[in-house]
Amino acid sequence: IPGESMEQEQLFSAHNLLDDLMDYVFSGKDCRVIFIGDTAQLPPVGTELSPALNARYLKSRYSVDIIEYELDQVMRQSLESGVLSNATRIRKMIGEEDHSVQVFDLNDQEDVLEVESDYLEDLLVGSYSDDKIEGSIIVTRSNKRANLYNREIRNRILYREYEIEAGDLMMIVKNNYFWLPENSEAGFLANGDIIEIMGVRNFEEVHGFRFADVTIRLLDYPDQQPLDVKIILDTIMAETPSLGREDGRKLYLSVLQDYEDIPEKSKRADKVRVDPYYNSLQVKFAYAMTCHKTQGGQWERVFIDYFRITSETLDTSALRWLYTAVTRSTDKVYLLGYPEHCFVR
């Protein structure tokens, strides 16, 4: 796939990854591409549909023949699961014209539970204990809310005193191709991968940003040896999904100045491409995340923060958000702060 859509140094123009992918696939002879996904989940940020899962869009834009299949056997939950029945309920509501605010059916449910505020802290303490922490997640509607939850969990439940410590779980929030060798099992550090901080060695401020040298392990690749990387601290509590375009441009230009003694422009760019500060890993804490960030992952215990429901009916985007959040769970769903009119009992 061309670097325009994948590499961090392309900060001055926007490119369409799907366009680049289709160009790459069909530049070969007799090539095919398979897109797999759930059309009821949240579409990419800033869009109302998932283009790669929309046959009409693909035919119109790329003039290709499309074959569609639908998988209907659930593998993540048992057929008797309340998580499954509520996910199915919401999915059906997405296809209906009238969207009732009675989203959740709590009748005889033991795995989809309303949590009263008086019991929330005790429940979180139990769920974020050492032997359960990797199986718990709070799903919330904004990075600002996620930051608040992450701060409270680290301070009041995990008793973390410093900005980042050994034992912290973090999510990579932007693909990184620098720190892992290509022949490793993972291949690269992917947006959405969960890591554990094994050790923190050094903090520094340079290029107008703050960095730390840390040792990490990849939770999804237990055979991968711990890895020494440099992370950028500014993204951790930012209210944006990752380092913004302007900040990325600022970092690029600052790093570029370190190599201004090199006369050839292409050679200066090559130096930036392998610079550890420019390639610093972008991360956020992984105790609470936005719904978009949780897509593709699964946890035993999913706490769903209240998604503001103020009208008599829900719009489709809100239902997609709730459906995506519910389907992250393999065991239990806890509903935080939802008013009574959201439930069927």
Residue ranges and their predicted role:
Residues P2-Q8, N107-D111, Y278, I304-T310:
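Short, basic, glycine/proline-bearing loop/turn elements
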Residues N16, D20, V25-V33, T39-M198, ...:
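Conserved helicase motor core of P-loop NTPases
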